[in-house]
Amino acid sequence: MDLLNTLPNIWPLISLFKISLLPKEIKEPGSRLENVHKKLEENTTKGLQGKATELAARHLRLSTYLLMAMFTYYLTPYPDITLDLKDESNRFYILYWAPFILSRNVIMVGSLYSGWHYFLYENKTMRGKLRSRKFDGRNLDENGDLIPAKGYHWKECAFWSINGIIIESFYECMVLQYWLTTKQTYTQFWSRPLISVLSLLFVGYWRDFHFYFAHRVMHPYFSTKSKWRNFDLGRFLYRNAHSLHHRSYNTGPWSGLSMHPIEHLIYFSCVFIPSIIIPQHPLAFLYNHFHVLVSPLPGHDGFGDPAGGSKFHFLHHAHFDVNFGTPMVPLDRLFGSYDDGHRHKTD
């Protein structure tokens, strides 16, 4: 059992291994949200937003997305970016790659989401080991089976998630076509060592910085009593787009990418924007690409360590007006929306 404490919780492989070491539990999941706040007394996120411990844990998880990027880049390299697009036969070369890119993303990412959902919510052995680690057990019945109507309609979430993968695949094709047209990217990683290394190091920070502001703009800013409420862009975006994501108030794996297409376009711009502004090696692009596609999965799975879920973001879904960003970049502290589990605590 010492391995549970000594091994880093790298999702998903180490997480699965650590779950397998857990004894089967008979303890019922918590039935009240107050239990969540009580557990947060020992939460590693508490008081650590932006500090070394949280950053170390975050970067260990980032290694999963980097490995996915390396696997994809070296096994299925992108088309030759030195093609002469003046040649009519090459002008729409990316169209030949679009079906492959879409298939690769749907299979790779969809398999991760469906597999993790199965392990946590369908597999009886795993369920029996993790029940007491469920943040809010009100959507599980007495046998541990999921009750979709209580905050996690996983089939509906899966539909919108697949839509999101399609939209991100479209963005990926646009970036490749842009690279073919402008020759802005480069294929030799060490030909520009400084920008190559820095772009990899800052992917996580950029994604979390972008996520906070992209997320915050989709929540109301003015109160319902404010005279400015009719001019509130956040209220409009929440009502017409982001509210779909918040249908999952007791989240599961498929909740992460369950978004309205408008929100998908905003969320995945995190990958598109830097790719057309700065020279970027395809490996850095893929790293960012898989980060935005896969990180919502463990972040929404609804369970604490070692399953890999995020209590920080769970509190956002539970309370709506807190924790818009991530623990890695302390923007919630800066703008006054940080909650370590006590802000909405009830007696």
Language-model segments: residues:
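Non-catalytic, topology-defining segments of multipass membrane proteins
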Residues: M1-C270, G325-M328, D332-D347
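C-terminal transmembrane module of eukaryotic multi-pass membrane proteins
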Residues: S258, E263-D347
